[in-house]
Curated annotation (Swiss-Prot):
Cofactor(s) needed by this chain: Mg(2+); Zn(2+)
InterPro entries: PRA-CH, PRib_AMP_CycHydrolase_dom, PRib_AMP_CycHydrolase_sf
Subcellular location(s) of the protein: Cytoplasm
Organism the protein comes from: Nitratidesulfovibrio vulgaris (strain ATCC 29579 / DSM 644 / CCUG 34227 / NCIMB 8303 / VKM B-1760 / Hildenborough)
EC number(s) given by UniProt: 3.5.4.19
Name this protein carries in UniProt: Phosphoribosyl-AMP cyclohydrolase
Cofactor binding, note field: Binds 1 Mg(2+) ion per subunit.
Subunit record text: Homodimer.
Sequence positions that bind Zn(2+): C77, C94, C101
Length: 126
């Protein structure tokens, strides 16, 4: 079996982690993971990330209840990017209330909202 350990040494201890809906293939979000976040994700079966702005680990959905249940974890060929195939519980991955953090789209020079808004952040993050 091939080693399954991200290379956290390439970028100062952090690697990008992409969360993708395991059923639909929709890209939900990108966040950062350090070794501790990766270990907690594997241990608990729910996504944990590292917040660069707060300088600490965070459990996705710990405040909102919009957790990400891990179905599978993949590493890219260089072991410096993580892909999480998830079941998005609660309906939204984005702290702005949208299903996906990639909710804005530019097509033919026009910008539009392309992901449904699931909740009002003012009501969830009081």
């Amino acid at each position: 079996m091939t080693a399954f350990v991200p290379d956290f040494g390439k970028a100062g201890g952090l690697v990008p982690a992409i969360a993708q809906d395991a059923d639909t293939g929709e890209v939900l979000m990108m966040a950062w993971m350090n070794a501790e976040a990766f270990e907690m994700t594997l241990k608990t079966g729910e996504a944990h990330y590292f917040s660069r702005s707060r300088g600490r680990l965070w459990h996705k959905g710990g405040t909102s209840g919009h957790t990400q249940h891990i179905r599978a974890v993949r590493l890219d060929c260089d072991s410096d990017t993580i892909l999480l195939l998830v079941e998005q519980r609660g309906g939204a991955a984005c702290h702005e209330g949208y299903r996906s953090c990639f909710y804005r789209e530019m097509k033919d020079g026009e910008v539009s909202i392309c992901s449904p808004k699931v909740f009002d952040p003012k009501e969830v993050y009081k």
